Curated annotation (Swiss-Prot):
Top-level enzyme category: oxidoreductase
Name of the gene: pdhb-1
An MF annotation (GO) of this entry: pyruvate dehydrogenase (acetyl-transferring) activity
Keyword vocabulary terms for this entry: Metal-binding, Mitochondrion, Oxidoreductase, Potassium, Pyruvate, Thiamine pyrophosphate, Transit peptide
Domain of life (superkingdom): Eukaryota
Catalytic activity: N(6)-[(R)-lipoyl]-L-lysyl-[protein] + pyruvate + H(+) = N(6)-[(R)-S(8)-acetyldihydrolipoyl]-L-lysyl-[protein] + CO2
Reported cofactor(s): thiamine diphosphate
Subunit comment: Tetramer of 2 alpha and 2 beta subunits.
GO biological process: one example: pyruvate decarboxylation to acetyl-CoA
Organism: Caenorhabditis elegans
Transit peptide endpoints, chain numbering: 1-21
Name of the protein in its database record: Pyruvate dehydrogenase E1 component subunit beta, mitochondrial
Signal peptide: none
Cellular compartment(s): Mitochondrion matrix
Lineage: Eukaryota, Metazoa, Ecdysozoa, Nematoda, Chromadorea
GO cellular component, one term: pyruvate dehydrogenase complex
């Protein structure tokens, strides 16, 4: 990743990878480090949610933060998403910068009024007088064997709403840099993590370990350069896309993989530049197909000069249009894989 230094602040640029892989870091540790650094940096920042303090969080994302920063900065709440989300929004109105953790974004539906009607609308309805600097974060999408009510992907839901920023990290670099940017942002940010990615380790450069490392919201990253097809994805879909790119390389297909990182604002320019080079486009997401992120990409392609650059129709790889089954074999059948991505690319390129 190319970087520029603004004063003491390291800011990640659009494309590429870290300058040097100094070590590895899990997504869990990256999120923990980001919150630790921002709580220390700004005394207006605090974390609240179910079991985030003494228990260290349901997924141990906040491990050690309560002991280090105390119960005014890391706050356990009752099991009432509507209640503690409302408290968090009110705190943001008052000038604090809360991080509101949902144990799973499936439960954010209990707090949807606070997110959509209070957090997302207040800056507009106050004519810019009342900013709402809040981060709603937690695991989103399919996990492992948690069935229909705990496996939903809300990316497209929240990206549909003006007034929100929506971020979907893939790697440890994404997780740390984007969460720090979200906490510093004066707008409400929905920060959609993935439970399966929490324990995965990624190489990180020296700059990622800096207290001042941030990744700009709204800028995609070219995870892998290629010439024959553009594969666009986010969150765990990037994993499938990169694995597919490796398989395609073995048959002589050079795939460019774009990690969107942010869904709103949306970096369509990176897609445009890539398709002008490859002339083929495949989108990958784990959520449902109807009105999904791939659908929005397709619409923007149709409405721009990118459409004239395509040598084949855009193809979408998505989850299956059903509630998530509980049975392991059926759950696997409901989610996209690298093989699905390879199949879509071959269809786009008209190769066997």
């Amino acid at each position: 990743m190319a970087l520029r230094k603004c004063g003491n602040l390291f800011v990640a640029r659009l494309a590429g990878t870290s300058t040097r892989a100094a070590s590895t870091m899990t997504v869990r540790d990256a999120l923990n480090q980001a919150m630790d650094e921002e709580i220390k940096r700004d005394d207006r920042v605090f974390l609240m949610g179910e079991e985030v303090a003494q228990y260290d969080g349901a997924y141990k994302i906040s491990k050690g933060l309560w002991k280090k920063h105390g119960d005014k900065r890391v706050v356990d709440t009752p099991i009432t998403e509507m209640g503690f989300a409302g408290i968090a929004v009110g705190a943001a109105f008052a000038g604090l910068r809360p991080i509101c953790e949902f144990m799973t974004f499936n439960f954010s539906m209990q707090a949807i009024d606070q997110i959509i009607n209070s957090a997302a609308k207040t800056y507009y309805m106050s004519a810019g007088r009342v900013p709402v600097p809040i981060v709603f974060r937690g695991p989103n999408g399919a996990a492992a064997g948690v069935a229909a009510q705990h496996s939903q992907d809300f990316s497209a839901w929240y990206a549909h709403c003006p007034g929100l920023k929506v971020v979907c990290p893939y790697s440890a670099e994404d997780a740390k840099g984007l969460l720090k940017a979200a906490i510093r942002d004066d707008n409400p940010v929905v920060f959609l993590e993935n439970e399966i990615l929490y324990g995965q380790s990624f190489p990180v450069g020296d700059e990622v370990l800096s207290d001042d490392f941030v990744v700009p919201i709204g800028k995609a990253k070219i995870e892998r350069a290629g010439d024959h097809v553009t594969i666009v994805s986010y969150s765990r879909g990037v994993e499938f896309s990169l694995e597919a790119a490796k398989q395609l390389e073995a048959i002589g297909v050079s795939a460019e993989v774009i990690n969107l990182r942010s869904l709103r604002p949306f970096d369509f320019e990176s897609i445009r530049q890539s398709v002008h080079k490859t002339h083929h486009l495949v989108s990958v997401e784990t959520g449902w197909p109807f009105a999904g992120i791939g659908s929005e990409i397709a619409a923007q392609v149709m409405e721009s000069d990118v459409f004239d650059q395509l040598d084949a129709p855009l193809l979408r790889v998505t989850g299956v249009d059903v509630p998530m089954p509980y049975t392991q074999t059926l759950e696997a059948a409901a989610l996209p894989t690298a093989e699905h991505v390879v199949k879509a690319v071959k269809k786009s390129l008209n190769i066997a």
